[in-house]
Amino acid sequence: ADELTYRTKALLSKANNKAEMDKILAQMQFLGSISTAQAETILNSLKSIWELPDYNKWLSSYSIISERDISVNGQLYRPDKIFYNEEETIIVDFKTGKKSSTHKKQVRNYIETIAKMGFPNPSGCLLYLSDIPELEFFK
């Protein structure tokens, strides 16, 4: 994966809504870490992800925890996003590059940990960042 894909992943992990996303992108441009053209490329990638029906629903109607460390029995976990309401919890991890079985294993560890913490009905979702973003759901 290229540098812009990694920046897109970082932005997705941090921003919980469009206003935050725009603010972070503007800061990145102001600091000179990305050009205007790169900002547009990232913005287009983010829009294609935020327009996915499931992701859009989570953003607009679920509580969100972003990149928070969770420590259980000396193990440290840091899911990219946790979307939750009274009925369900979706743990989303953003991935660059090729699919790997270790990705599911990582998110299954998150699911187990979140369940122990009392979050309702946890499930996992891998979001692969590519030209066409792809969500992969599992329990």
Predicted regions and their residues:
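Nucleic-acid nuclease catalytic cores
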Residues: 72-139
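Nuclease catalytic cores
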Residues: 1-79, 83-86, 104, 127
